Amino acid sequence: MRVLIVKTSSMGDVLHTLPALTDAQQAIPGIKFDWVVEEGFAQIPSWHAAVERVIPVAIRRWRKAWFSAPIKAERKAFREALQAKNYDAVIDAQGLVKSAALVTRLAHGVKHGMDWQTAREPLASLFYNRKHHIAKQQHAVERTRELFAKSLGYSKPQTQGDYAIAQHFLTNLPTDAGEYAVFLHATTRDDKHWPEEHWRELIGLLADSGIRIKLPWGAPHEEERAKRLAEGFAYVEVLPKMSLEGVARVLAGAKFVVSVDTGLSHLTAALDRPNITVYGPTDPGLIGGYGKNQMVCRAPGNELSQLTANAVKQFIEENAEKAAMI
């Protein structure tokens, strides 16, 4: 059985789709998936054993010059790749009009998605041949697992979902795996940042733990922040610029992770690493970290500036034994 997945973005949403593939793989021996995903996240599906082909799409980039000759050529090549095979099922797990119209509509196969009442954008359901009612009041991972189960005709397991990508990195862990923590300090929204002085204070509080700390970054301003956080601490390393797979490899070898609400926090969860995520204004309820040893540290009054380094250090200590952290 061959299935096409349409789940293009964001990083967290793409990662939250992986447990559904594991369910399907266990329920339907020999099933294989092709996956349409935004080019920036194209490495992620390849980490799952059930994915045979990744079809990158670049809607975010294309829309800036939709009718230019180079973009038209890219769109033509994408359409040819998308339509190269006939699928037993096409599952649109994105639930948006944009992806339904530009991707799902063009694919060859019976198209499945959430119905008018439960799709993220109800109009997207008009592009599906089979519409499934998926209750909204459950975690995003569970919604996607249910969508796959109903689309492919098996019962959704009652056990916790398994991302099944950690093993991809087990044979290529960093040489110092288990000897360091990773601090994920970067996020896209200002109100989701934990103040730099709190990060530095936490780093100082861990001086006697014997653990080293690694700081990844993506954009230049994040690199500058990482350098400020590391200044004066010999046991803190600002990592070089890395691919997503490179960052994943570092996370896979971490003893534990402390993070803000960001896509890499979901990647940590997918890699089964102990992770403390500090939350301020965002609600982790239905979209927060899902998986083993994922811990939520809420800021007083939902204001991250009010969450002290001492409080996070205490949270780490209280959870250290059960999460095998320090």
Swiss-Prot record:
Pathway: Bacterial outer membrane biogenesis; LPS core biosynthesis. Pfam families: Glyco_transf_9 (PF01075). Keywords: Cell inner membrane, Cell membrane, Glycosyltransferase, Lipopolysaccharide biosynthesis, Membrane, Transferase. The keyword Ubl conjugation does not apply. GO terms for molecular function: ADP-heptose-lipopolysaccharide heptosyltransferase activity. Glycosyltransferase involved in the biosynthesis of the core oligosaccharide region of lipopolysaccharide (LPS). Catalyzes the addition of the first heptose unit to one 3-deoxy-D-manno-octulosonic acid (Kdo) residue of the Kdo2-lipid A module. Composed of two domains connected by an extended peptide linker. Displays the classical GT-B fold. Does not undergo a domain rotation, characteristic of the GT-B family, upon substrate binding, but allows the substrate analog and the reaction product to adopt remarkably distinct conformations inside the active site. Monomer. This is Lipopolysaccharide heptosyltransferase 1.
